[in-house]
Curated annotation (Swiss-Prot):
GO terms for biological process: nucleotide-excision repair; SOS response. The UvrABC repair system catalyzes the recognition and processing of DNA lesions. UvrC both incises the 5' and 3' sides of the lesion. The N-terminal half is responsible for the 3' incision and the C-terminal half is responsible for the 5' incision. Interacts with UvrB in an incision complex. It comes from the Bacteria. Keywords: Cytoplasm, DNA damage, DNA excision, DNA repair, Excision nuclease, SOS response. It holds the Pfam family UvrC_RNaseH. Residues 204-239 form the UVR domain. It comes from Dehalococcoides mccartyi (strain CBDB1). One of its GO terms (molecular function) is excinuclease ABC activity. This is UvrABC system protein C. Residues 15-94 form the GIY-YIG domain. The gene is uvrC.
Length: 607
């Protein structure tokens, strides 16, 4: 029940569009929202708790004070909301993680001899900006490609023409030395124009222009210039070949999809210009727990395009976005031309979104692994597991188990081992299911556990089987856990610690406990368990595909998302065999027509 002051504030709210700010007892802004009608929107929070999500219930319980700002339209409210979220970073808002100062590329068109460099701020100074980029690594790579292609100056001298001797960058072919008159002003300006076209995704235009300039230089016997153009042409062709998408796309568009775990979402954006992938960026969103997919995409789009220097005419999203009409109106105003937002639910847009979503899932997994890479984090994770699960010691050795089959055929099981939080691949083991007929995962798990622990006391057990785990992790919920616990009891291992991790809600099940344990999404302990479970799944799936191939039912390439019959034939033709594909480097795979970097990554991981 709101306090008296809050009730009076709610009662006096106007029926205008605007922005509302919710504060806690300490005066901290904990949520910022916009509304077409302030009174109706704010009153919708103060309803019976059964009609609210747990996250909204938690927000409402902390509201102590309310402020609002009236705007002339809902579009003005959207812009004001964005600025307030960026300034205050309220806890309950969906917000970009570490969004302070994303890097941009700046072209100093206000200078006589323009430079291109990285900056974290934009100013109305006559420069041209491209971005934002998600991290400095990606923007540095782009800058390096530009430098190799166009050899613009990087020094910050205000009067470079006064220097008579070229610097080291000229000697190593990284600068055309305008400071010594090695290039005319018109030629240098032309070069910068090409760099801008390149950043806009118009590499085809740059390529045609360079071919013409090379031929003209050759015709006038200017072989040095012709050789420079030839090298630029070769470099651009290499870039274009790496931009081919597995999905057939045309025109200019951004494709946006995300993967979510609890309170954290990883958003992937593909930038497509003239049917080619000219770049992609990943962004972390915080505060997404219990948020609707359309709301997550809407909040990201607002925050991303608020600071983006390039807005395409079309944006394809994984799900229909909330506030689509007002977003389109706002983006169209920013672009100066019509912008359409559409959900990729079928056909070619769905094919494209599936690729983007797969990249988002991979980026989220890599972020989780990176977060667990430090010994301090791993120690924290193991200590948290000890406390949460009631173990006597931190689990030094964790074994993860999973089953893989299709309707009971070619069924296999996997065992992966993590010691002190790190995978020990030499101890991984796989099992071909021998006694179970049909699709009975529970019985298959029983067989795997019986065979694994039946070897503990055998002389030929080996180090992997001779040692008992501190903790067993089963991929599944109550049913799978009960089957395994029953098997362990029959083997006389009643005291063996075992848990199940159910994927849908990431809940941890313990024997003899009716309610699962729920850890925070950013918990090191949960992230470690997720990594063990995912590794067991990957190892089981890889063995299952191998068995299917040997039985003649399929190629090992089957089951890899995005690899259909035509791409499978092309890969076999290029590398000769599945073994040749397996041995090919990531770079070689990425160069095959129709195989983009995301698909090459999937092939390397699953083959």
């Amino acid at each position: 029940m709101p306090n008296e002051t809050l009730q009076n504030q709610i009662a006096s709210l106007p029926e205008n569009p605007g922005v509302y700010l919710m504060k806690n007892a300490q005066g901290e802004i904990i949520y910022v929202g916009k509304a077409a009608v302030l009174k109706d929107r704010v009153k919708s929070y103060f309803v019976p708790p059964s009609r609210l999500t747990p996250k909204t219930c938690q927000l409402v319980s902390q509201i102590n004070e309310l402020e609002y700002l009236i705007t002339g339209s809902e579009q003005e409210a959207l812009i004001l909301e964005l600025n307030l979220i960026k300034r205050h970073r309220p806890y309950f808002n969906v917000r970009l993680k570490d969004d302070k100062g994303f890097p941009y590329l700046k072209i100093t068109l206000n200078e006589k001899w323009p430079r291109i460099y990285i900056t974290r701020s934009m100013a109305d100074d006559g420069g041209r900006y491209f971005g934002p980029f998600a991290n400095t690594r990606s923007v540095r790579h782009t800058l390096q490609v530009l430098k190799e292609l166009f050899r613009f100056r990087s020094c910050n001298r205000t009067e470079p023409e006064k220097h008579s001797r070229p610097c080291l960058e000229y000697d190593i072919h990284q600068c055309l030395s305008p400071c010594t008159g090695k290039i005319s002003k018109s030629d240098y300006d032309h070069l910068i124009s090409q760099a801008i076209l390149f950043l806009e995704g118009k590499q085809d235009q740059v390529l045609k222009l360079l071919i013409r300039l090379m031929n003209e230089a050759s015709a006038r016997l200017d072989y040095e210039t012709a050789a420079l153009r030839r090298d630029q042409i070769a470099s651009i062709k290499e870039v274009i070949e790496g931009q081919q998408l597995a999905a057939r796309v045309t025109g200019e568009q951004d494709a946006i999809a995300f993967a979510q775990e609890g309170d954290l979402s990883m958003v992937q954006v593909f930038f497509i210009r003239r049917g080619k992938l000219i770049g992609r960026e990943s962004f972390c969103l915080q505060g997404t727990r219990e948020e609707k997919p359309g709301d997550i995409l809407s909040e990201f789009a607002k925050q991303f395009y608020h600071s983006s220097t390039q807005i395409p005419p079309k944006i394809v999203t994984q799900y229909p976005v909330s506030d689509r009409e007002i977003l389109e109106k706002w983006l169209s105003q920013r672009r100066g031309d019509k912008v359409h937002i559409t959900a990729g639910l079928r056909g070619q847009p769905k094919e494209l979104i599936n690729i983007v979503a797969e990249n988002a899932r991979e980026q989220l997994k890599q972020a989780r692994i990176k977060n667990l890479s430090s010994s301090v984090t791993l120690t924290d994770a193991l200590a948290e597991l000890q406390t949460a699960l009631g173990l006597s010691l931190p689990p030094q050795r964790i074994e993860g188990y999973d089953i893989s089959n299709i309707q009971g055929t070619n069924a296999v099981g996997s065992m992966v081992v993590f010691e002190n939080g790190k995978p020990q691949k030499a101890h991984y083991r796989r099992f071909r299911i021998k006694t179970v007929k049909g699709a009975d995962d529970f019985s298959m798990l029983k067989e795997v556990i019986s065979r694994r622990f039946g070897r503990v006391h055998r002389e030929d057990a080996g180090e992997s089987f001779a040692r008992l785990p501190s903790l067993m992790l089963i991929d599944g919920g109550k049913g799978q856990l009960s089957s395994v616990k029953e098997t362990l009891d029959k083997l006389g291992l009643e005291g063996q610690a075992v848990i199940g991790l159910a994927k849908e809600f990431e809940e941890i099940y313990l024997p003899h406990k009716s309610e699962p344990i729920r850890l925070a999404a950013n918990s090191p302990a949960l992230q470690l368990l997720q990594r063990v479970r995912d590794e067991a799944h990957r190892f089981a799936l890889g063995y299952h595909l191998h068995i299917r191939q040997k039985s003649g039912l399929t190629s090992a390439l089957d089951g890899i998302p995005g690899v259909g019959p035509s791409r499978r034939r092309l890969l076999i033709k290029t590398f000769g065999s599945v073994a040749g594909i397996r041995q090919a480097s990531f770079e070689k795979l990425s160069q095959v027509k129709g195989i983009n970097q995301a698909l090459a990554l999937s092939i390397k991981e699953l083959l």
